[in-house]
Amino acid sequence: MSELKPHQPRRSAIRNWARVAAGMVFGLLVAMLVGSVSSALIGAVIGWDIMALCHLALIYWRLATVDEHTLAGRAAEIDQGRRVLTAVFVAAAIASLGAIAVMVRGGHDPAALALASVTILISWLLMHSVFAAHYAHRYFQTGQGLIFPGDTAPRFGEFVYFALTVGMTYQVSDVTTDSQAMRRLVLTHAVIAFGFNTVIIAITVGLVASLI
């Protein structure tokens, strides 16, 4: 297998950022368009949904269909570190709160309930998918941190499985951790997921129950 030239990883990272930026611009345009014919809040929420869906499409398009050798390089391109993880979590939380506000204002409007539910689901899935990409990057970067059952090298689906397990149960299952750094990362993920699930989803369920 031929080695990559030094400039190639940088070009790949630039292309990845260009794709992310294109999704953000598209989302902003949709937000402005919807906001001009509806409320600014609804426009902002729908704009976030478009941005998040574009980023989800990028993650799964680039990572979900490749073997472990290609996955190692692409995960490094997609993952932008803890700052991006933090930014995604904050944006997802704000968008979800905005969706809850839309639901409260809409009262019994089915469209408002549907928009709020879809937004929270998209935000939740994006948060854990970004963590899955980060887990994949850390795993292939260090060669340790996670131990997967079986003899085959993990694909991206295994990292999504691990991220969703942590995000829904706040613990690991048959995939185990074997480094202090990975345990700290898993703990951070579990705490963030617990906070999101407890505050955002609990409020949403309570409001939906009161409106039915």
Give the residues covered by each predicted segment.
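Interfacial loop-to-transmembrane junctions
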Residues: 176-195
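Membrane-water interface of transmembrane alpha-helices
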Residues: 55-68, 129-141
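Membrane-proximal soluble regions of multi-pass membrane proteins
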Residues: 139, 144-179
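The first (N-terminal) embedded transmembrane alpha-helix
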Residues: 13-36, 94, 197
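Juxtamembrane helix-capping/reentrant segments at transmembrane boundaries
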Residues: 71-91
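Membrane-helix interface/capping segments
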Residues: 60-78, 100-104
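Loop-to-helix transition at the N-terminal end of transmembrane alpha-helices
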Residues: 40-57
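Helix-coil boundary and interhelical linker segments in multi-pass alpha-helical membrane proteins
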Residues: 30-43, 101-115, 208-212
